[in-house]
């Protein structure tokens, strides 16, 4: 426990809140090659690798992921949600924050239905999260 004299000399410091998605917090100005600390909810990037990964201990699956180089120069791992995808090596994608609990190092999700990523086919429920269009009513 600190004494009052010690606290007067050097007060307690606030804990710094660390971001869970740091790649979304930086913008790169290519004209003067400087980064600015401005948060953006989504970032555009180009896939450099697309593959599958096995999850942590109690779970078992082949989860789809992509390594994406963002417009600010960061290279991150992103999860591809939904069944089936059309992403290849040079596909342009949109990323949002949000980790996948059982995949180590994956802190971002790819937004389905934007840019080069198509929505999930034949999706009926929670369509907006997977970029699926409203199905035509049967007449």
Curated annotation (Swiss-Prot):
GO terms for cellular component: ribosome; small ribosomal subunit. InterPro entries: NA-bd_OB-fold (IPR012340), Ribosomal_uS12 (IPR006032), Ribosomal_uS12_bac (IPR005679). Gene3D superfamilies: Nucleic acid-binding proteins. The keyword Hydrolase does not apply. It comes from the Bacteria. Coiled coil: none annotated. Pfam families: Ribosom_S12_S23. One of its GO terms (biological process) is translation. Keywords: Ribonucleoprotein, Ribosomal protein, RNA-binding, rRNA-binding, tRNA-binding. Residues 119-139 are annotated as: Disordered. One of its GO terms (molecular function) is structural constituent of ribosome. Belongs to the universal ribosomal protein uS12 family. Part of the 30S ribosomal subunit. Contacts proteins S8 and S17. May interact with IF1 in the 30S initiation complex. With S4 and S5 plays an important role in translational accuracy. This is Small ribosomal subunit protein uS12. It comes from Mycoplasma genitalium (strain ATCC 33530 / DSM 19775 / NCTC 10195 / G37).
């Amino acid at each position: 426990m600190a004494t009052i004299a010690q606290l007067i000399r050097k007060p307690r410091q606030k804990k710094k809140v660390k971001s869970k998605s740091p790649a979304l917090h930086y913008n790169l100005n290519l004209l003067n090659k400087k980064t600015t600390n401005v948060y953006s909810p989504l970032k555009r990037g180009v896939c450099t690798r697309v593959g599958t990964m096995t999850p942590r201990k109690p779970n078992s699956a082949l989860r789809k992921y992509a390594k994406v180089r963002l417009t600010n120069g960061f290279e991150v791992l992103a999860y591809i949600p939904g069944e089936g995808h059309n992403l290849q090596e040079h596909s342009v994608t949109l990323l949002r924050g949000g980790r996948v609990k059982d995949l180590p190092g994956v802190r971002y999700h790819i937004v389905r239905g934007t840019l080069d990523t198509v929505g999930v086919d034949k999706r009926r429920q929670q369509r907006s999260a997977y970029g699926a269009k409203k199905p035509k009513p049967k007449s």
